[in-house]
Structures are given as C-alpha cells and as structure tokens.
C-alpha cells in the first residue's frame, strides 16, 4: 500500500491509499548453492533500529534503508548476507530474513523485543515445527551463541529457508546444513507447493495466461 501522491509534505493523511501488487518469476534469493549448501554471513556493524525509532515489526518500504546499509557492507566484505544486532547487542535478524539457531535439538529465535520483523515465513516455520512435534523457543540470543550453535538458518518469503554455514569466518556446526534445518526446509517446500493437504489453505491459486507461460518457456 502507498500514499505516494496527492499532497506534498510529511503529512500523508490526506493522500489516497493505493495497493500495488507485482508478480514475477524469482529464483533463489541467496542463490541455489546457498540454499543447498548454506551461506556465509557476517555480523553487521549496522544495528537494527529500535521500537522507539520506527516500527520494526512492520514490513514498510521506508524502513529498508537500515537493511540496505547492512547488506551493502556485507556484500562488499565478500559475504552473502548480514546478521543485524538489536540495540542491546543481542541477535535480531538478517537484512531481509528472520534468523533461527538450533542448539541441542532446540529451535531458538530472537524475541520480538529484539526488533525482529513479524515475518510470514517466520510464522510458517512456527507452525511447521509444531506439526513435526517441535517447538520454537523465543528468547534473547547473544552474538557469541551464533558461533557455538549446532545449526543456524534464515527464513523469508524471498529467501525461503536457507542454512548458514559460516558466520564471521567461523564454521557453524559441521559446516553443512544440519538435520533440523533440512527437515524444516523440506516441509516448507512441501507446504508452498501444495503437497501438505492440511496446509493447502495457506495457498491462493493464481491463473497465469497461456501466453505468459509460453513466453517463460
């Protein structure tokens, strides 16, 4: 939704609200190799903004400058993705993804008080974990816990479920995607492709004109 026209100035209340929906083919956001083998991440020097500055739980385009700065820093340093810390130094999220760690078989995520986006894919992982008999624990995660975790993975609509194999040049676990990450990755793929009957209500079929399908092929 946007209030991008109608009035000049910083008060948008008299501007009309429009909704724009764009759809296009998109491959693996962090690369097919990253999705299969894991990505290399770096803890960014840019902190995630706090709730007293903006609304971190909301997906608003104006808030992405924070993430853009972290992403640019990370890519220039030779890594695939950034991990951002909250204002108190605890783990918050990736530049465009939520983050989870696995320790002793337990799935742990930062709490919403760590300025995390209330992501749809994050909620999906909660439900898929519950379906498989697991729970997701929300608690503060210290930066140092990233380095000693058995597994780390990220989630997002674009990224889907992506393993993290290195953080700040430290190998995570075995250096390969772990069993919990793989299980959730497979469940996510099954859910979004309609292969889990109980989760078909998550999907909305979209009719693609035959001409568009022919053009893609």
Q: Each predicted region: which residue ranges?
A:
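Helix-start/capping segments and mature chain N-termini
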Residues: 2-217
């Amino acid at each position: 939704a946007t209030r991008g026209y109608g009035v000049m100035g910083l008060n948008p209340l008299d501007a009309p609200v429009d909704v724009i929906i764009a759809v296009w083919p998109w491959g693996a956001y962090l690369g097919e190799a990253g999705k299969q083998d894991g990505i290399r991440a770096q803890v960014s020097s840019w902190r995630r903004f706090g709730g007293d500055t903006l609304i971190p739980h909301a997906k608003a385009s104006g808030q992405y400058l924070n993430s853009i700065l972290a992403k640019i820093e990370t890519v220039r340093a030779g890594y695939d993705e950034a991990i951002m810390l909250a204002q108190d130094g605890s783990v918050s999220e990736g530049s465009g993804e939520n983050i989870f760690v696995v320790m002793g078989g337990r799935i742990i995520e930062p709490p919403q008080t760590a300025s995390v986006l209330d992501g749809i894919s994050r909620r999906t992982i909660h439900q898929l974990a519950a379906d498989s008999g697991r729970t997701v624990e929300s608690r503060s995660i210290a930066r140092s816990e990233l380095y000693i975790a058995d597994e780390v993975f990220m989630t997002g609509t674009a990224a889907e479920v992506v393993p993290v194999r290195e953080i700040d040049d430290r190998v995570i676990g075995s250096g390969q995607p772990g069993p919990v990450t793989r299980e959730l990755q497979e469940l996510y793929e099954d859910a979004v492709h309609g292969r889990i009957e109980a989760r078909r209500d998550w999907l909305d079929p979209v009719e693609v004109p035959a001409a568009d399908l022919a053009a893609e092929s």
